[in-house]
Curated annotation (Swiss-Prot):
Signal peptide feature range: none
Residues where Zn(2+) binds: H79, H236, D240
Catalysed conversion reaction: a UDP-3-O-[(3R)-3-hydroxyacyl]-N-acetyl-alpha-D-glucosamine + H2O = a UDP-3-O-[(3R)-3-hydroxyacyl]-alpha-D-glucosamine + acetate
E.C. number: 3.5.1.108
Biological process according to GO: lipid A biosynthetic process
Name recorded for this polypeptide: UDP-3-O-acyl-N-acetylglucosamine deacetylase
Lineage: Bacteria, Pseudomonadati, Pseudomonadota, Alphaproteobacteria, Rickettsiales
Active site per database record: H263 (proton donor)
Amino acid sequence: MQQSTLLKPVSCYGIGVHSGKRTQLTIEPTKENTGIIFIRTDISSENNYIEASYFNVSDTLLSTTISNDHKVQISTIEHLMAALWGCSIDNAIIKIDGPEVPIMDGSSKPFVFMIECAGKKLQNAPKKYLKILKDIKVVHKDCELYCTPSDHMTVDLTIDFSSKAIGRQNLSFRDQESFTKNIADARTFGFIRDVDYLKSKGLAQGASFENAIGIDEQDKILNPNGLRYEDEFVRHKLLDLFGDLYTNGTSIVSAIKGYKTSHALNNELLHRIFSDTTSYKFVTSSEL
């Protein structure tokens, strides 16, 4: 299997869910073995680019933020990263004229649509995979995420909320190709009781029912059209997991299991994997 990039550039406009700032984002093709690179076009400096890598993750509060050594940052990258992973895009340049990726409708679907409109180009380099060789586990209080060796990627994810609108939900995922049909359109969510506090901290400035599922104090879904799936919440957490894990630069070949995962836990798993060179190896499809 070969690496892929886009056939042509594709752009969108939107607001950041936390910053509330309107930005333009363009996904551009690039050469083999580049990976995913973000460029802040509103900063006129050679220091305006950031590699979408787990070691550049600088904040995981409610979203995933990456930054470089010059303190240039881009936040809320996970939905776009999930779309790139789900569409098997290995190499792309992301140009953005602001500090936050547009939230769009709160899911990955608009980014999947953009990539499908641009088309995909196979490149003259083998696609790489991260194959897990030993059991690795990260735990924070009652939250946990672990991966074990496997010949295929599988994910089993459970979430557990006290809110009756969500409750306990579980989802198993076996096929990357089904991401665009079954996971990509699952939206982010939040509780109305938290909005004032978040806004006082400079967060959720762009949040609305157009880009998030809102849940009130009576555990009622406030969006006029309701949910897209009965288990949309766990689907979105799975989406976040894929986006965060793609900051390792490849698809992971492992059996992954998570309980009450978070952006912080997702990132910690990657750090734990790469801290032990005997726990993984990079392979091509012919070596799987």
